[in-house]
């Protein structure tokens, strides 16, 4: 059975992703790490297709010891990072939590994955995946008549939230 780590899985998008992947792959086990801040709710995880394949852990992606322990205990080969402080107005009023979670938390996930996957387990790049979920906010504003954004569009964030993603 494959096991993935989903961070921010109690939020709207993360929980819908969990519902989807569990429906699509009946052999998949999901470890769901979420701090349960203002954006997350365990109500979003009701009616999972097979609750026995879902394990919820309340915790912080900035906690490297916890992340490393989860990777090792569950032999995780894929991380899908939805965890984020994501409220634009809150980021303007107080940007530090956004930097902490969105920048340092992602760096912690990447570092723990590197330590486990590449140094300790020595898996090849074909065996591991890290999916970071961002936002179109990183590109700034799109005015009527502007060309659509592409992968080559330069970043032009308009808020601390967008800059932190």
What are these regions (language model features)?
Residues 1-165:
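N-terminal Rossmann-like NAD(P)+-binding domain of SDR-like oxidoreductases, especially those catalyzing
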């Amino acid at each position: 059975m494959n096991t993935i780590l989903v961070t921010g899985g109690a939020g709207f998008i993360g929980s819908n992703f969990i519902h989807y992947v569990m429906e699509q792959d009946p052999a998949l086990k999901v470890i769901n790490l979420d701090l349960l801040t203002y954006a997350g709710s365990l109500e979003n995880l009701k009616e999972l297709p097979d609750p026995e394949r879902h394990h919820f852990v309340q915790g912080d992606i900035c906690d490297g010891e916890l992340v490393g322990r989860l990777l090792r205990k569950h032999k995780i080969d894929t991380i899908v990072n939805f965890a984020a402080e994501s409220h634009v107005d809150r980021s303007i009023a107080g940007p530090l939590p956004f930097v902490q979670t969105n920048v340092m938390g992602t760096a912690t996930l990447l570092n723990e994955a590197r330590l486990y996957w590449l140094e300790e387990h020595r898996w090849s790049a074909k065996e591991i995946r890290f999916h970071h979920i961002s936002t179109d906010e990183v590109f700034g504003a799109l005015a009527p008549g502007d060309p659509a954004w592409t992968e080559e569009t330069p970043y032009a964030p308009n808020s601390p939230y967008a800059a932190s993603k």
